[in-house]
């Protein structure tokens, strides 16, 4: 809003706030983005809160429960070994950051773990089984299971883009050898807790993953899938009485289906990626004393895009590459999303779980995308590597960028929207719509010119070092995060899942042929069978002009 006034040559405006009256103190509002005031005066812009200092963690076990870190006993033992290696206790930023970086959400520990079933260790992990298909039948797959997206060989296509993206220039047409990108990921926990923003940031994060494939690529269209317990629309249908209505922890299935589809569609519409397909499944069942249902919902965001074959693989970082962040400021938003989303919803307090939910900003993401698109369209792409800021914010994204070489981050260069943030909150907040890039030093000025044209906030926050060490350094020289890359990623213990085979049998379906018409009517009413337009056709599905029906 402030930038709009600046573009209109309205000087002297540094901050714009929106206020609206409410009846009483019980009025609903988003505590991350809004605050309830008893009156408006100049003092509302003042705060006496100071950033919390760097804290040494004396007891990792207590910290684990207090902060909702979802660390396993084996991981806690591992951190004690790291303390011994360092000869010191870990900081709150290091413990918190490690928990996010190595959460199930970020590292797929269950999929990559060891399974022992009926006393026998399985010959491969779930991830290895999935990868086996591609290994044995690669066909046209170029890259899979090692980047933000998968790429398959595409056709030769025409690219219509400016010759020089840093200035007003003629558009030229040239042939490029393309790759097709595919991506899907769940955003279950955030959508369960706060459906609109949960689904919106799920869609936004999936788009950023396609932006961050190789050294940059372009999203085209999105999809969304929702799975919930029965919504009981209009008072409920008779088969929905199989289980009593639960006291839902956050939102009802009906609210989730409506708000989540609103959120996913809204983000795509504002960003400029149409949501063109989707699905929904509602299910509950009770038999043999066991109850089944999608009480913790599934929200699957997916999409397709394309890029150039030239850019489909990341390059090797070299010492001296500049670490660049594109996008918005840091706020107290989305703290601990990786770890909290990796356990059962409801395990931690409402405060911890609500703090872990991100908030969407599609306009900022569009600005970041415009810059990345421009760099990928040029004859020389200056991007060495690229990752999106999702779970765990800077500490996860930037550490992935420098995983092969190490790096140092100057915290003074990180954009701060809330001056009360502690070092831990700056390092690990999940303020959305940011991308991390490694840029060759020689191209930095050119990239900055394009960023200014696209109004994409760009910050040079550090550089790669080549010493396999990663640290965040404050202005005073203190290091709230200071670990070897190997200590962050390399040797955390494998997850071991022990289970046994359980034989189950269910009653056969019984029916009367005379009731076929009724059965058919009921089946056609199921959300999984009925028309999905109410979920997928909410907004413009031809935005960008690249999708036709």
Task: Please place each PLM-identified region on the residue numbering.
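Contiguous, structured surface segment used for ligand recognition
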Residues: 2
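Glycine/proline-enriched, intrinsically flexible loops and inter-domain linkers
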Residues: 6-549
């Amino acid at each position: 809003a402030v930038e709009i006034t600046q573009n209109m040559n309205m000087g002297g405006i540094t901050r714009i706030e929106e206020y609206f009256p409410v009846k009483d103190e019980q009025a609903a509002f988003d505590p991350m983005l809004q605050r309830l005031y008893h009156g408006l005066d100049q003092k509302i812009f003042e705060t006496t809160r100071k950033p919390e200092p760097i804290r040494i963690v004396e007891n990792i076990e207590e910290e684990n429960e207090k902060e909702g870190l979802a660390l396993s006993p084996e991981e806690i033992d591992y951190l004690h070994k790291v303390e011994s290696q360092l000869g010191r206790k870990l900081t709150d930023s290091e413990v918190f950051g490690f928990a996010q970086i190595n959460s199930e959400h970020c590292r797929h520990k269950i999929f990559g773990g060891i399974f022992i079933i009926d006393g026998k260790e399985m010959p491969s992990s779930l991830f290895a089984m999935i990868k086996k298909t591609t290994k044995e039948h690669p066909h046209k797959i170029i890259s899979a299971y090692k980047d933000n997206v998968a790429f398959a060989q595409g056709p030769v296509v025409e690219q219509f883009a400016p010759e020089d993206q840093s200035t007003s220039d003629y558009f030229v047409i040239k042939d490029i050898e393309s790759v097709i990108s595919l991506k899907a990921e769940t955003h279950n926990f955030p959508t369960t807790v706060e459906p609109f923003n949960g689904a919106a940031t799920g869609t936004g994060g999936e788009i950023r993953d396609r932006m961050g494939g190789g050294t940059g690529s372009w999203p085209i269209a999105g999809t969304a899938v929702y799975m919930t317990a029965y919504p009981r629309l209009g008072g409920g249908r008779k088969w929905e009485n199989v289980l009593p209505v639960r006291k839902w922890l956050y939102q009802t299935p009906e609210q989730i289906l409506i708000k989540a589809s609103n959120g996913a569609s809204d983000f795509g519409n504002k960003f400029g990626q149409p949501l063109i397909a989707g699905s929904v499944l509602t299910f509950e069942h009770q038999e043999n004393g066991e109850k089944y249902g999608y009480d913790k919902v599934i929200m699957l965001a997916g999409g397709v895009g394309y890029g150039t074959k030239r850019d489909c693989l990341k390059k090797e970082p070299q010492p001296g590459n500049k670490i660049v962040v594109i996008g918005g400021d840091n706020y107290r938003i989305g703290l601990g999303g990786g770890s909290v989303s990796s356990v059962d919803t409801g395990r931690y307090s409402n405060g911890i779980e609500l703090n872990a939910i991100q908030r969407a900003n599609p306009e900022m993401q569009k600005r970041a995308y415009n810059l990345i698109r421009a760099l990928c369209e040029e004859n020389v792409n200056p991007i060495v590597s690229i990752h999106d800021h999702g779970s765990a914010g800077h500490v996860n994204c930037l550490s992935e960028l420098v995983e092969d070489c190490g790096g140092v981050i100057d915290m003074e260069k990180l954009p701060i929207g809330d001056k009360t943030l502690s070092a831990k909150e700056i390092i690990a907040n999940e303020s959305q719509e940011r991308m991390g890039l490694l840029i060759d030093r020689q191209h930095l000025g050119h990239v900055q010119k394009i960023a200014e044209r696209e109004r994409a906030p760009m910050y040079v926050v550090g550089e790669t070092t080549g010493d396999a060490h990663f640290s965040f350094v404050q202005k005073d020289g203190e290091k709230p995060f200071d670990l070897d890359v190997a200590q962050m990623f390399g040797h955390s213990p494998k997850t071991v899942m022990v289970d046994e085979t359980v034989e189950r049998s269910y009653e056969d379906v019984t029916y009367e042929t005379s009731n076929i018409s009724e059965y058919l009517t009921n089946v056609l009413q199921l959300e999984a069978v009925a028309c999905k337009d109410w979920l997928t056709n909410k907004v413009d599905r031809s935005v960008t002009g690249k999708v036709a029906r």
